[in-house]
Amino acid sequence: MEFSKLSAPTLKELFIEQLENLILSGKLSIGEKLPSERELADSMQVSRSVVNAGLAEIADKGFLEILPRSGTYVADYRKKGKLDTLVSIMKFNGGTLPDADILSILQIRKVLTVLALELAIPRITDDEIKQLFNCSAKLDEENESVNAAELVFEFDHLLCIFSGNTLLPLIFYSFKAPNTTLFERFFRLYGYDAMRKRTEAICIAIRSRDFASAKNIIVNSIDETISGSTKIYR
């Protein structure tokens, strides 16, 4: 096994993590005004430049609202957040997501993947179909959950690319972190056979230009992870 290089977090990263944890834990409530940058720097023993850069990044994620000549306030991240916010929530929960967020991700994935199939099947080339089969074959040989999760994501992302819609691959890719986390969880709970069969069956349906069958495979597969025999949240 090859081990990766370890690196210590920067002061800014530590500052961001601590403040986000205070917000996500509820110790800092929505609407609460933060101390001044100078007070934060003094109490946390960091420079004002670290505080300033950290607050800007946290605000960009939707956790804070910085009002000129007024101060910095805790924002409702459910209303103002974005994908980076979701990654912070995952880190706070030890790499997992609340059940409501898992359900939401699965629902979004179903909508995006079905749209990708609908757009891709009428225009997909033989070479693109070959790429999908190659990705499916790699999954058949993979027995490590992290790598297998990457392959499943790659397969679905290829579908988005082959759809011809210029925005669909970008939107789908923005959900990579939570999606691969859920795939890893799926493989740890249920093994690899179900996802291998699903991926190969989609390839066969696409090769036959059979959108109805491909859609049925995707929808049934995701519905099973929501409320069926391969459910991946409580």
Which ranges hold each PLM region?
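Short acidic-aromatic low-complexity motifs
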Residues: 206-209
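A short secondary-structure junction motif
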Residues: 22, 26, 81, 166, ...
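Solvent-exposed, non-membrane alpha-helical residues enriched in polar/charged side chains
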Residues: 20, 24-25, 160, 203, ...
